[in-house]
Amino acid sequence: MASSSSNRQFSHRNANTFLTYPKCPENPEIACQMIWELVVRWIPKYILCAREAHKDGSLHLHALLQTEKPVRISDSRFFDINGFHPNIQSAKSVNRVRDYILKEPLAVFERGTFIPRKSPFLGKSDSEVKEKKPSKDEIMRDIISHSTSKEEYLSMIQKELPFDWSTKLQYFEYSANKLFPEIQEEFTNPHPPSSPDLLCNESINDWLQPNIFQVSPEAYMLLQPACYTLDDAISDLQWMDSVSSHQMKDQESRASTSSAQQEQENLLGPEA
């Protein structure tokens, strides 16, 4: 089976974007500049990149991007940098995402001015106002629109809905198989396409001789209790081969409709 994929349309639309590049050793400053240039049309205002280390020592990169206009993309490869593909998510709480990125960084780079989320009525930050928690429908809608593979889809559910993931994993696996069906490998004919070679006479004969046409004396003795010696079995088989060969020749000669082959006299028809 090939790696899973889907013809489902990827979609991301948000002014706050959270990117995670797994197993990416890229320098945060270089990554920031490359991502900044990708979103110039949406007027970037702030970007933060941080390099972190996994427990196994491999490096990964987190990035928080804020733009004046919502980034609108339908290409899941839009944010790829130097061959590294990120997980793309909407940053629902920029303050929390920023705190998460800065928890244990090995290297950090920022550009622009961070825009903390404010309450539209009270003008207070996230730390002062309790944010409205997104519903499960909203979370799943965001996961479906942003995931690009079966593994990424299940990983995002495990992160966002850990209890549901642990108790309803079989249902999520079912939906993952529907969203990202396995691509069937194209059949490759092991035989060459040309007619003479396609017959594979050598291979067929190698199978026919021992399985169809050949009867060993030993096998014949097992089927004929009255045959006691190997010589008798060989003699019987030779006799049967001779008789059957003559019978086949006789049948071929009788099957002909040619009067010349049957050596019949051509009689003259009645005179007019």
UniProtKB/Swiss-Prot annotation:
Main location: host cell
Listed Pfam families: Gemini_AL1, Gemini_AL1_M
Region annotation (Disordered) ranges: 245-272
Residue numbers spanned by region Oligomerization: 175-187
Cofactor: Mg(2+); Mn(2+)
GO biological process: DNA replication; symbiont-mediated perturbation of host cell cycle G1/S transition checkpoint
Skewed-composition ranges (Polar residues): 254-265
Disulphide bonds in the chain: none
Region annotation Binding to RBR1: where it falls in the sequence: 198-202
Active-site residue numbers: 100
Protein EC: 3.1.21.-
Transactivation: annotated span: 221-230
Motif (RCR-3): 100-103
GO cellular component: a single term: host cell cytoplasm
Molecular function terms, GO-annotated: DNA binding; endodeoxyribonuclease activity, producing 5'-phosphomonoesters; metal ion binding; nucleotide binding; nucleotidyltransferase activity; structural molecule activity
Subcellular location: Host nucleus; Host cytoplasm
Binding site for a divalent metal cation: 52, 60, 62, 104
SUPFAM superfamilies reported for this sequence: Origin of replication-binding domain, RBD-like
Presence of the UniProt keyword Lipoprotein in the record: no
Cofactor comment text: Divalent metal cations, possibly Mg(2+) or Mn(2+).
Domain CRESS-DNA virus Rep endonuclease: 11-114
Motif interval(s): RCR-1: 18-21
Main function: Implicated in enhancement of V-sense gene expression. Acts a an inhibitor of C-sense gene transcription.
Domain remark text: There are 3 rolling circle replication (RCR) motifs. RCR-2 may be involved in metal coordination. RCR-3 is required for phosphodiester bond cleavage for initiation of RCR.
Family designation: Belongs to the geminiviridae Rep protein family.
Name of the protein described by the UniProt record: Replication-associated protein A
Organism: Maize streak virus genotype A (isolate Kenya)
